[in-house]
Amino acid sequence: MSVNTKNWQELKKPTQLDVKESSDKARKATFIAEPLERGYGLTLGNALRRVLLASLQGAAITSIKIENVLHEFSSLAGVREDVTDIVLNVKQIALKMEGEGPKRLQLSATGPAEVKAGDIAVSGDIEVMNKDLVICHLDEGATLNMELTADIGSGYVPAVQNRPADAPIGLIPVDSLYSPIRQVSYKVEKARVGQELDFDKLSLTIETDGTVTPEDAVAYAARILQDQLTLFVHFEDGIPQPQSAMIGVAAEPQQDDANQLNRYLLKKVDELELSVRSANCLKNDNIIYIGDLVQKTEAEMLRTPNFGRKSLNEIKEVLSSMGLRLGMDIPGWPPENIEEMAKKLEQELLG
């Protein structure tokens, strides 16, 4: 099949993603992409916003059980808030949770006290992000013993769906807002390329609850869109595919592409002529071959100590020039005899 690659190769694309961090950079940031073809700012901005708000997974409280309380319309002696108010406060707890759920958490307090989210007893794989959130107030002599259930999910789940069929008496289901995203907005402006002003500039502002950074959030959203759109591409566009990289004997028509891709993957990263900062970051992260590098995602790279957005853009540009990118899946990597393969392939290409 003849594929007109000009359909996408000749479109204007941003060469890098600029990030404007707020005072609380772990929770809020603005991402600026330019230049984009006319109309693409709205297309990408709206798609990313919808995915960010609806599809990212997070942790939330799904139910609570309070000692000596039968239902949410009860009250506790010595507790200033009604159980209904306590439930409303519990819904605002922001959790960062590793592994699978559900998991049980305990909260015990004796008055007089101001009970906060930070008083919840958690295990090593759960972290309360908003520890100063006030849950209730206890008077002198009052006690509070509460069991909270946390789980992982996406979107919004009403309390009625969080009640199991075999729920014990006293279990109070809670509305769960799993999304780690608190707010997303975008703005599209005109961008200049040379003397032309017929391009878009997209500014995407993301605010999270602190359980995920804005950089990771936008990367997850873009990856979701990428994964969903792959279904619609029914042809190969001539870019070397990673699946053929580790094939020992490729079919004759594909031999050149396989050798070319193998040559890149088996090349060491210290041959890429990167800046000293980028090269040191890769070395410290034990990334030796390009095959090691391309399997890393952008989010993983940004978590590398001293590795910033400037280094990321530098590496992406170098990989792009070779028809490669971050986040590739290479079955069988690394091969057991990687050093021997690298030397042999280099000799074949030179010979």
UniProtKB/Swiss-Prot annotation:
GO terms for biological process: DNA-templated transcription. Keywords: DNA-directed RNA polymerase, Nucleotidyltransferase, Transcription, Transferase. One of its GO terms (molecular function) is protein dimerization activity. Its EC number is 2.7.7.6. It catalyses: RNA(n) + a ribonucleoside 5'-triphosphate = RNA(n+1) + diphosphate. The keyword Transferase applies. Residues 1-236 are annotated as: Alpha N-terminal domain (alpha-NTD). Residues 256-351 are annotated as: Alpha C-terminal domain (alpha-CTD). It comes from the Bacteria. One of its GO terms (cellular component) is DNA-directed RNA polymerase complex. It is an enzyme of class 2 (transferase). Belongs to the RNA polymerase alpha chain family. HAMAP family: RNApol_bact_RpoA. Homodimer. The RNAP catalytic core consists of 2 alpha, 1 beta, 1 beta' and 1 omega subunit. When a sigma factor is associated with the core the holoenzyme is formed, which can initiate transcription. The N-terminal domain is essential for RNAP assembly and basal transcription, whereas the C-terminal domain is involved in interaction with transcriptional regulators and with upstream promoter elements. DNA-dependent RNA polymerase catalyzes the transcription of DNA into RNA using the four ribonucleoside triphosphates as substrates. This is DNA-directed RNA polymerase subunit alpha. It comes from Erythrobacter litoralis (strain HTCC2594). The lineage of its organism: Bacteria, Pseudomonadati, Pseudomonadota, Alphaproteobacteria, Sphingomonadales.
